[in-house]
C-alpha cells in the first residue's frame, strides 16, 4: 500500500512539475520566498495594534508559538524521523525534474515546512479575524505557496499534504489556547471585541496586491 501511494506521488510529481516556463519560474521563485510576504505580516501586526495593545502582544506571542509549533513538528520531528528524500534528491527522478536557479533544498522533504507554516498562519488568523473574504483569500494564498514547492521541484505532493495537515493542527491548537486564555483578568476581556471589517479588508487587499505585483514584475524579468 505504501509503495503504491509512493509510486502515485512520484508520477503526480513528475506530471505537475512538467508544466513550467521562464515566466512562471520567476513567479513561483518569488512566491516561495519568505521575505516576499513581509508586507502581509506587517499589515497584520498593524491591525493587531490598532485594536488593543494587550491583545496585540498576546497574539504576537501566540503567532510565535504557532510558527514554532508548525515548524518544529515538520522540520524538527517528522523530517528526521521519516527521512523521506525530496524529489530533487530521489535518484529515480531527480535528473528529469525542472528546477529554478539551481535550488534543490536539503535532503529530506516530508513534510513541507512551507506548507505547514503558511497554512498555520492563514488558518489561525482566519479563525481570529472571523472574516469570510480574508479566510478564502488567505487559504488560496497558502495553497499557492504550497504549490510553488512542487513547481520548484523540491517537494512531492504528499509532502505538501502532510504539511497542510500539520498547519491545520497547529492553527487549531493555537486558536484553542487563544480562546482558552482570552478571558484572563490580565487581558481585561480585550479579546472578546471583534476586529474591524475595514482593517481586515486592508489585510486582504495587501495580500492580493502583493500577489499581483509578483505576477506583474515577473513579466519584466
Q: Each predicted region: which residue ranges?
A:
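N-terminal transmembrane-helix/juxtamembrane module of multi-pass inner/ER membrane proteins
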Residues: 1-39, 74-104, 218-221
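Membrane-helix interfacial "entry" motifs
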Residues: 18-26, 51-60, 151-156, 194-195
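Hydrophobic alpha-helical transmembrane segments
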Residues: 31-48, 61, 114-117, 136-137
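Transmembrane helix interruption/hinge and helix-loop junction motifs
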Residues: 34-35, 51-54, 129-133
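Hydrophobic, lipid-facing residues on alpha-helical transmembrane segments of integral membrane proteins
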Residues: 35, 61-73, 77, 161, ...
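Membrane-water interface at transmembrane helix exits
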Residues: 45-49, 70, 74-83, 126, ...
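Interfacial segments of alpha-helical transmembrane regions
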Residues: 45-73, 135-136
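Membrane-embedded catalytic cores of phosphoryl/pyrophosphoryl-handling enzymes
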Residues: 98-221
Amino acid at each position: 500500500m505504501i509503495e503504491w501511494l509512493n509510486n502515485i506521488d512520484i508520477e503526480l510529481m513528475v506530471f505537475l512539475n512538467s508544466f513550467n516556463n521562464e515566466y512562471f519560474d520567476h513567479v513561483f521563485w518569488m512566491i516561495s520566498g519568505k521575505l516576499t510576504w513581509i508586507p502581509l505580516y506587517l499589515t497584520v501586526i498593524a491591525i493587531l495594534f490598532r485594536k488593543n495593545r494587550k491583545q496585540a502582544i498576546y497574539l504576537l506571542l501566540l503567532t510565535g508559538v504557532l510558527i514554532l509549533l508548525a515548524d518544529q513538528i515538520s522540520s524538527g520531528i517528522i523530517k528526521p524521523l521519516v527521512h523521506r528524500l525530496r524529489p530533487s534528491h530521489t535518484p529515480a527522478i531527480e535528473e528529469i525534474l525542472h528546477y529554478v536557479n539551481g535550488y534543490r533544498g536539503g535532503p529530506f522533504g516530508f513534510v513541507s515546512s512551507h506548507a505547514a507554516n503558511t497554512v498555520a498562519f492563514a488558518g489561525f488568523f482566519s479563525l481570529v479575524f472571523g472574516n469570510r473574504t480574508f479566510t478564502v483569500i488567505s487559504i488560496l494564498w497558502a495553497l499557492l505557496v504550497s504549490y510553488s514547492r512542487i513547481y520548484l521541484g523540491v517537494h512531492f505532493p504528499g509532502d505538501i499534504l502532510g504539511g497542510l495537515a500539520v498547519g491545520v493542527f497547529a492553527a487549531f491548537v493555537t486558536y484553542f489556547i487563544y480562546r482558552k486564555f482570552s478571558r484572563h483578568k490580565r487581558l481585561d476581556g480585550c479579546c472578546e471585541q471583534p476586529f474591524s471589517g475595514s482593517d481586515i479588508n486592508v489585510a486582504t487587499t495587501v495580500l492580493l496586491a502583493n500577489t499581483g505585483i509578483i505576477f506583474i514584475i515577473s513579466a519584466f524579468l
